[in-house]
């Protein structure tokens, strides 16, 4: 599958990027803006949850270690309200057991630094799991 096919899926979706590091947040937002209709950002888990409650983004990309509300707690809070919410963790932590634990929670995993290839490999199953009305067909 190439980037054009992925763009067909993503071009009408809105996403939320949660990252406390300003440089990483802005660079990831810029990358995603080529693929998605809307890319909102949050500086921490609490800011993200407040935004998500108002907008219910199609996909949430989140770091794990953040002030006020961690990425783990954010995932838990969102999944309490919307168990099928598409979530992607963005982390430099590469431990296989850790990644498997996230997978069992219906959370996808993207390793920092984020590459276009890695992003596309995660987006394909994430987009396929979205309800049909959100798949951009």
What are these regions (language model features)?
Residues 1-14, 117-137:
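Non-catalytic signal-transmission and effector/linker regions of two-component phosphorelay proteins
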Residues 18-19, 42, 60:
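Conserved sequence signature across two-component system core domains
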Residues 21-40:
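Two-component/phosphorelay signaling modules centered on CheY-like receiver
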Residues 44-47, 70-73:
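Acidic catalytic/metal-coordinating carboxylates
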Residues 63:
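Active-site residues of response regulator receiver
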Residues 66:
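Receiver (REC) domain active-site loop signature in two-component systems and cognate sites
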Residues 73, 94-111, 121:
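Alpha4 helix (beta4-alpha4-beta5 surface) of REC/receiver domains from two-component response regulators
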């Amino acid at each position: 599958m190439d980037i054009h096919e992925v763009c067909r899926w993503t071009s009408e979706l809105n996403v939320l990027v949660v990252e406390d590091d300003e440089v990483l947040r802005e660079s990831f937002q810029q990358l995603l803006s080529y693929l998605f209709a809307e890319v909102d950002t949050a500086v921490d888990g609490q800011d993200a949850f407040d935004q998500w409650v108002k907008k219910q983004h199609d996909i949430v990309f989140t770091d794990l270690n953040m002030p006020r509300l961690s990425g783990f707690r954010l995932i838990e809070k969102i999944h309490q309200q919307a168990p099928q919410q598409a979530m992607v963790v963005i982390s430099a932590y590469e431990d296989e057991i850790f990644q498997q634990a996230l997978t069992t929670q219906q959370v996808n995993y993207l390793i920092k630094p984020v590459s276009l290839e890695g992003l596309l490999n995660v987006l394909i199953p994430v987009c396929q799991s979205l309800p049909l009305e959100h798949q951009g067909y």
